Amino acid sequence: MAGSREVVAMDCEMVGMGPRRESGLARCSLVNVHGAVLYDKFIQPEGEITDYRTRVSGVTPQHMVGATPFAVARLEILQLLKGKLVVGHDLKHDFQALKEDMNRYTIYDTSTDMLLWREAKLDHCRRVSLRVLCERLLHKSIQNSLLGHSSVEDAKATMELYQISQRIRARRGLPRLAVSD
C-alpha cells in the first residue's frame, strides 16, 4: 500500500429496508486528510424504508424529503473514491450499502489495525468499536448523541485514527500506508 495517493475517509449510515430490514444506504459522508467535508448527503435508498434506525443512524423521515436518489449518490461517491486510499471503520458494511466490491479499492480499516489496538491496549479483543478507539486514542467521546450517529463525525474520527496509525508506523520504522498532503 505504500506510495503517493490521496486519502479520503468515508462513513455511511443505513436504514432497514423491506420486511427483513436489510440495510439500505441513507447517508454518506467523506472527509479529506484535514477533516474537511468533501461529501455529505442524505440518500433515498432503493425500496421501502421499514426501520429508520434513528437511534443509531440519526436518520429520520424528514431527512428523506429531497434526499438524493441512490443511483445518483452512488455514482457521485464512487467518483470521489476513485484512485484514493479509502479510510473507515468496518468498511465492508459501507461498501455493501453502496453495492460496490470493496476489493476494487485500496482501503485502510481502523477495525482491523492491530497497531491501533495495541496502542489502545486492546490487543485481547476480537472486535473494537470506533467509539472505544476514539476514547482510548483520541481522548474524545463520539456516537453519544441521543439523535444517533453522525457520519461526518465518524469519518473525521477514522481519519484521525489513520493519522495516529501513520505516526506509530513512522515511530517503529514500519512502511507508511500512503503519503498525502
Swiss-Prot record:
Reaction equation(s) it catalyzes: Exonucleolytic cleavage in the 3'- to 5'-direction to yield nucleoside 5'-phosphates
GO biological processes: defense response to virus; DNA catabolic process; innate immune response; negative regulation of viral genome replication; RNA catabolic process; RNA processing; rRNA processing
Binding annotation for Mn(2+) 2: D90, H93
EC number from the UniProt entry: 3.1.13.1
UniProt family annotation: Belongs to the exonuclease superfamily.
MF terms (GO), sorted A to Z: exonuclease activity; exoribonuclease II activity; metal ion binding; U1 snRNA binding; U2 snRNA binding; U3 snoRNA binding
GO cellular component, one term: nucleus
UniProt remark on cofactor binding: Binds 2 manganese ions per subunit.
Subcellular location: Nucleus; Nucleus, Nucleolus; Cytoplasm; Nucleus, Cajal body
Reported function: Interferon-induced antiviral exoribonuclease that acts mainly on single-stranded RNA. Inhibition of several viruses does not involve the degradation of viral RNAs, but rather the inhibition of translation of viral proteins. Exerts a translational control over a large panel of non-self RNA substrates while sparing endogenous transcripts. This activity correlates with the protein's ability to localize in cytoplasmic processing bodies. May also act as master regulator of over hundred interferon stimulated genes leading to viral genome translation inhibition.
Keyword list, A-Z: Antiviral defense, Cytoplasm, Exonuclease, Hydrolase, Immunity, Innate immunity, Manganese, Metal-binding, Nuclease, Nucleus, RNA-binding, rRNA processing
Cofactors (names): Mn(2+)
Subunit and interaction comment: Associates with PML and SP100 in the PML NB complex. Associates with survival motor neuron protein (SMN)-containing macromolecular nuclear complexes and U1 and U2 snRNAs and U3 snoRNA.
Protein name, as recorded: Interferon-stimulated gene 20 kDa protein
Major subcellular site: nucleus
Gene name of the record: Isg20
Reported induction: Induced by interferons alpha and beta. Weaker induction was seen with interferon gamma. Increased expression was seen at the transcriptional level.
pH dependence (record): Optimum pH is 7.0.
Record: residues binding Mn(2+) 1: D11, E13, D154
Keyword Nuclease attached: yes
Pfam families, sorted: RNase_T
